[in-house]
Amino acid sequence: MAQPASPRGVGLVGPSTLLIRFLSFCITENHPDVMTNPLPDALLSYARRTVVVTGAATGMGAETVALLLETGAEVHALDIAEVTTPVTSAQHVDLGDPASIDGVLDDLPPRIDALMHCAGIPGGTRFDPRTVVRVNFLGLRHLTEAVFDRMGDDASITSIASLAGGGWPGHRTEIFELLATDDFVAGDAWLDGRDDLVGDGYSFSKECVQFWTMWRSTSAIRSGVRVNAICPGVTDTKIMVDFRQAMGDAAIDMTADAGIGRLASPTEMAPAMLFLGHHQAASYINGVNLDIDGGFMAALTTGQVDFSKYNLGS
């Protein structure tokens, strides 16, 4: 089967792929015996792997799709926006509507090697809190359970959570209750009367994604499916304006400055999605929420953030 054309050029030529090639060269140059080990090939290829990606049209999802195509994957894209990348199939879906999700199931492949949840919407003024939770968590869960039987040994589910979801320990009991609901509709009904818990929807929805990742990983691995998530820090996507409105410039700037000193790029998130989703490179990684924040949480945890530099009340 001919490989799809890469949006970054022809074949395996993207910057992330070149980095992986270089690392593999260094490994084999210094340790020739590793040539008998499958790891170098594992780092280079998604060939013959079928991957479903939500939120594939823009931002981190689009970068994930681009890198998957560079590494040989068969990509099936889902998004409410038009997907222009040359994927195997692209379906319009609203993850905030279970009927919309159910409507595309017949168009998805019978076997799915990796499911990558990249769709998400911000809190703030553009979306009401219930819609945010529906899209960011309830839809994610609904799609996962709807296609789970199509996944088997060596399959993976990888989601984009957020550093903003790190408050889940304070809401463990409530999140357990939400996870106990049977389906999308029951989960949505559970939100009734819990406006204080839900807030603007974003942090709570990402708390749910983080906790669900750990919770679902234990049962999923019995079927050979690993479940992980990445937790990006402040990332320069088109919804950054929403985060600045919701959190304030000072909080965004502090999160960026305390680590590497700049916002992340969506291109810096895609390689982590591919790594965690890979059946060989990450074969023993399960139930992990991986912070990708330029070192912000390390600085915060060790008391190295100078809060006095920022007017966090503004």
What does each model-identified segment do?
Residues 23, 27-50:
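Flexible N-terminal pre-Rossmann segment of NAD(P)-dependent oxidoreductases
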Residues 40-75:
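Canonical Rossmann dinucleotide-binding motif of NAD(H)/NADP(H)-dependent dehydrogenases/reductases
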Residues 86-99:
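Rossmann-fold cofactor-recognition segment
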Residues 121-125, 153-222, 234:
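Catalytic loop of short-chain dehydrogenase/reductase
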Residues 226, 285-287:
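Short, small/polar-rich loop/turn modules that mediate ligand/substrate recognition or access, typified
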Residues 231-242, 298:
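Short, flexible catalytic-loop segment of classical short-chain dehydrogenase/reductase
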Residues 258-269:
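A conserved structural motif in NAD(P)-dependent oxidoreductases
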